[in-house]
Amino acid sequence: MAVAVPPGRAAGSGWAWRPVARDALLARAFHSCTELRGRFYLVGGLLAGGAREPSSDTVVFDPARGQAVRLGARGSPPRSHHDAAPVDGRWLCVVGGWDGSRRLATVTALDTERGVWEAWTGTPGDCPPAGLSSHTCTRISDRELQVAGREGGIHTQRRYGSIYTLRLDPSARTYCYKQEGCHTASRSGHCAALLQTPGPHPGHQLLLFGGCNLAEPEVAGHWSHGKIKEEPPVAPHLMEQLARLVSSGQGSQKGPHGLRHHSCSVVGPFAVLFGGETLTRARDTICNDLYIYDTRTSPPLWFHFPCADRGMKRMGHRTCLWNDQLYLVGGFGEDGRTASPQVCILDFI
């Protein structure tokens, strides 16, 4: 178990990744991992570092039983560096990514009731990105996603990031991209967090972290009170534990500099980031640090909790929130080539 207790701190102010399952089916990186009806759906990814061809399989992990099975649904798309989101509690929509030959902006959906993959089609008014990989898709309603990332094909990449609203219609099996009027910094391998804004004028904002040589988060969208209908998972115990951990640390207004291919999960007022690859070093680039972005204060504060266990270095992994626990799934380890078959939960000591 990877344990990290800050020097001079007592028990109760440390954290650990505690292994709860291990299966070779889960060993992958740059995959998507999406919770839907109490199951984690892992789609695609790279099975080894340096691989050019992404996996085309879908693995379902049952966190209650600690068991993984390969889904037999036909038509599972080969994808890596994509993102995915649940829709209407039934469909798993995979957006963009690398298929082994090009970057895509298409939507492919798994009907979890019928066990069938479907290629959805763009509507006549659709204005899709040129191509997406290492982007983010954030639910802002049950049928709307906010897509953020750098567009481009194999040979050309934009010098800025684009923001799209992606509307999904499961009954018609269609989707429609609408480009928003603003741009962001050129980011790839970043993460996104939809967080409530405190203060006298509450609302929501979408923040982008990392994916470029910057430390500051960037606002990619802002909604006034009542506009966002998306209800985040309730995790009161985990939120309490994170608050206790933060109270043992020293906050800073500066976040991690030049981090990419890390994970991010929103737990109440906290964005919890882990691992990733740093752009600030030529060697030993894969990280095992825990960062917590606390929005309860104004301005929000960063808290950094290092980990001494090099075996927990990860990049291209995912974290997933379920049943008041934060799960860590997959990713390449310290060598940047070997995918982890472990599932861990964030524990506190």
Swiss-Prot record:
Q: Can you provide one Gene Ontology molecular function annotated for this UniProt record?
A: cyclin binding
Q: Does the keyword Repeat apply?
A: yes
Q: In the UniProt record, does the keyword Transmembrane occur?
A: no
SUPFAM superfamilies for this protein:
Galactose oxidase, central domain (SSF50965)
What Pfam families would the database entry show?
Kelch_KLHDC2_KLHL20_DRC7
Instruction: Return the InterPro entries for the record.
Output: Gal_Oxase/kelch_b-propeller (IPR011043), Kelch-typ_b-propeller (IPR015915), KLDC9 (IPR042941)
UniProt keyword terms in alphabetical order: Kelch repeat, Repeat
> Superkingdom of the source?
Eukaryota
In the record for this protein, the Kelch repeats are positioned at: 39-89, 91-137, 325-349
Q: How does it assemble?
A: Interacts with CCNA1.
Protein name in the entry: Kelch domain-containing protein 9
Q: Which organism is it from?
A: Homo sapiens (Human)
Gene name, please? KLHDC9
